[in-house]
């Protein structure tokens, strides 16, 4: 299962929710039904979402038969999951972000640096948050400057540390 978004807190008193999309184009989340809500195992189909609208950097959604704030409690604060096969097949050397979470980071000398804990999108480029010796380091996801090689099958990402101002010391 892949996390493609999150249902947040209730919005107002009429059964609306905040919903955050993690897809590259925010609206694409509505192309991948059914959704499974992680904690409650509730399945939501396209016809369950009776209305949605953009609200700042996320969406407000209205789910069928949820008409007040109390009824929202079974839905809130849950990741939205889909099955891997629901995503389009990719070409060679393409990958989804969730594919790199299982990769280990190595430097150019083949020394293991750590594993990816998060991907941060700062609007200009993404940054990998890596756990290294119980501390977090941040690597810009810029190819080929910092990211030299990605091998999803071997679960390896090779990075160049020479431009990172010794943040590993």
UniProtKB/Swiss-Prot annotation:
Complex and partners: Binds ribosomal protein uS19.
Lineage: Bacteria, Pseudomonadati, Pseudomonadota, Gammaproteobacteria, Enterobacterales
Free-text comment on this protein's domains from its UniProt entry: The PRC barrel domain binds ribosomal protein uS19.
Functional note: An accessory protein needed during the final step in the assembly of 30S ribosomal subunit, possibly for assembly of the head region. Essential for efficient processing of 16S rRNA. May be needed both before and after RbfA during the maturation of 16S rRNA. It has affinity for free ribosomal 30S subunits but not for 70S ribosomes.
A GO MF label: ribosome binding
Keyword Transferase among record annotations: no
Predominant localisation class: cytoplasm
Protein name: Ribosome maturation factor RimM
Compartment(s) where it occurs, according to its Swiss-Prot or TrEMBL record: Cytoplasm
Coiled coil: none
Keyword set, alphabetical order: Chaperone, Cytoplasm, Ribosome biogenesis, rRNA processing
